[in-house]
């Protein structure tokens, strides 16, 4: 879908601002998809740095939000940092995926990543020389399962889910 085109999603729960495209998931869909125990392990690659794995686990949740803990590991599973806990509302999680219509295109794409095969909504946001691409798995509400950032066409950062544990 080109920026500025009328989106197919008509539910108000997906559109947080009139000048933004609909988000891939509503706050309620994220809540349902991120019960305690939901864990995502993602391989992070940053230009000029060693690869590492970022682990995010939902610890608890209620009608308003969730507490999660996150830490980093080596690709072999050795812990690099201690878990840090944070709490966000479900709406705050949703707001991370709210993107300006004037800078963003939405498409559909199937991806094969180490965490599995997913039918995704692909959001591509262009800001000057920066292109950020987010792949949100329809069967895995919450954070993107894959993310890439390019500057002047060069890949400078990526995060790819290597494991997606549903929890609950």
For the regions a language model picked out, list residue spans one by one.
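Acidic, serine/threonine-rich low-complexity disordered tracts
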Residues: 1-168
